[in-house]
Amino acid sequence: MADPARARKLAVRIREVVASALERGVKDPRLGMVTVTEVRVTPDLVDATVFYTVYGDEDARRASAEALESARGLLRSQVGRATGVKVTPTLTFVHDRLPDDAKHLEDLISVARERDARLAEVRRDARPAGDEDPYRRPRTVDEDDEDEDEDLVDEFDEFDRVEELDADAGDALGGDAGAREAGASAGRQVYPASPGGDPTAGR
């Protein structure tokens, strides 16, 4: 009967045994700096896949793979003695490309960041080739003079309106004075009109 929990526990133990054996027990000169990254055991505890990485170039990886294949029987025997299981799982060694892929991805991200930084610096120092607003027509001296002339005309018109109002007010006051003089000659008292009031008030 499959027992996933037991398979995980056995995988951890196999990883420890194989890593220790590669460090102390295997004397193959082809074996490089090998690191056991993970071990997966099937639920029936029959097969174990050992994932590993090798520090170095492609030649170092190839030589280490050959050394592991040669030492597979020895390593399986040590696993059987260390774990005490009835049937020692077969060992299959697989080069773990995940760290290499992760490093490659980090390198790509680093290159992209450097490129973005250079582009940002270029944009910061860039200046527009033309005017900021190419559709904005600059004002001319003649247009400025026309605006000043229009302002002067408006001021003169306002001054004329004020004089007209003053003249109308003077005519109204003069009419009241004439009425008072005519009334006095006729022996009557004439009162000036007061807006909103009674002209006879105060007699």
Curated annotation (Swiss-Prot):
<dbReference type="GO" id="GO:0043024">
    <property type="term" value="F:ribosomal small subunit binding"/>
</dbReference>
<dbReference type="InterPro" id="IPR020053">
    <property type="entry name" value="Ribosome-bd_factorA_CS"/>
</dbReference>
<keyword id="KW-0690">Ribosome biogenesis</keyword>
<feature type="compositionally biased region" description="Basic and acidic residues">
    <location>
        <begin position="119"/>
        <end position="141"/>
    </location>
</feature>
<feature type="compositionally biased region" description="Acidic residues">
    <location>
        <begin position="142"/>
        <end position="169"/>
    </location>
</feature>
<comment type="function">
    <text>One of several proteins that assist in the late maturation steps of the functional core of the 30S ribosomal subunit. Associates with free 30S ribosomal subunits (but not with 30S subunits that are part of 70S ribosomes or polysomes). Required for efficient processing of 16S rRNA. May interact with the 5'-terminal helix region of 16S rRNA.</text>
</comment>
<dbReference type="GO" id="GO:0030490">
    <property type="term" value="P:maturation of SSU-rRNA"/>
</dbReference>
<comment type="similarity">
    <text>Belongs to the RbfA family.</text>
</comment>
<dbReference type="InterPro" id="IPR023799">
    <property type="entry name" value="RbfA_dom_sf"/>
</dbReference>
<protein>
    <recommendedName>
        <fullName>Ribosome-binding factor A</fullName>
    </recommendedName>
</protein>
<dbReference type="Pfam" id="PF02033">
    <property type="entry name" value="RBFA"/>
</dbReference>
<comment type="subunit">
    <text>Monomer. Binds 30S ribosomal subunits, but not 50S ribosomal subunits or 70S ribosomes.</text>
</comment>
<feature type="region of interest" description="Disordered">
    <location>
        <begin position="119"/>
        <end position="203"/>
    </location>
</feature>
<dbReference type="InterPro" id="IPR015946">
    <property type="entry name" value="KH_dom-like_a/b"/>
</dbReference>
<dbReference type="GO" id="GO:0005829">
    <property type="term" value="C:cytosol"/>
</dbReference>
<keyword id="KW-0963">Cytoplasm</keyword>
<dbReference type="InterPro" id="IPR000238">
    <property type="entry name" value="RbfA"/>
</dbReference>
